[in-house]
Amino acid sequence: MTLALRSIDAENYARIVLPLTAPLWAAGRDFESYTRQTLELARSGYGRTHYSTIGLYDGALLCASCKCYEREIRLGDRTLKAIGIGAVFTPDELRGRGYASAMLAALMDREHAVGSDALYLFSDIAPAFYEALGFVAFPSRVFSFRSDDLPHARMSIKQATPEDRAAIRRLFSRHERSRPWSLKRTPLYWEWIYLRTRHGSEHPGDDALTFVLREGSRVDAFVTGVRSAAHDSFIVDEIGIRDERERDLIAPFLRSAAGDLRRIVGWLPPEPIRRMLPRGTIRRRKDAIFMVAPLTRAAHAWVRSASGAGSGDAVWSTDHI
């Protein structure tokens, strides 16, 4: 048996792998839509330059596959190169033979050789599987509070327009720069997020909404999420505020964004937004657990200091892959 990593181009990935993964990840989409949207992502600006699909082969036999996403980590004044791993898959008839582990180990070796600092992923299974390969779990939590427990204030919130995007990006970037580290967002990655949002990748069946609190042409706050009638909840993806001294705006702003839904929920956001949230229930996530495998000395030092630091989580739900 000779195992080897090979690239799979987007069309062959759609032809060979997607029919197998659709029951897991099509999320209610018909197969035609699932395939079309996957190819659209691969052909996007970010997809053409920073996204790839690979397989572990034994001769001509595809034993396992995954998606790779190139990102950069801002660590103070330094930049680390990271590779996100998603859609780790082994065909049913080949499971239990260690192919997924072999693929990830080979990928770690390859990326270390070309100068990458770390791999990361979001685990939907017990972290022990990935910990055995060298991944470290970061705190991964969700928050929840009742809408009726939040103060009500008369405020005129509006749905964001495309003209608001630049202001929203500035607010988001301001918060991210105040953190010790964060995943960088390039213009191409922002476009990738917008495309995945239009696809409903994270919230199938619900329309994503972005609300802004605007003073004239100035955006003072924004929140992105979905109003999910099925869960009777407003699910928050991202939130930002122009002036942290106005943090008392956040609670009534979220209540207004929730409309008549009973609860407001979401991934626990990173600092500084985490400390501005109203008091509520916080619990560990059972899925999408953020994990990092450091490959270099700099990445090992970062993971040691960051994996248990701070009261907020490490990443936003929009970073999920």
Question: Whereabouts are the PLM-identified features?
Answer:
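Core nucleotidyl-transferase/polymerase catalytic module
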Residues: 48, 63, 69, 86, ...
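A short, internal acetyl-CoA/4′-phosphopantetheine-binding micro-motif in the GNAT/acyltransferase core
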Residues: 85-95, 235-246
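Conserved acetyl-CoA pyrophosphate-binding loop and the N-cap/start of the following alpha-helix
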Residues: 94-106, 244-253
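Conserved GNAT acetyl-CoA-binding A-motif
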Residues: 109-123, 259-270
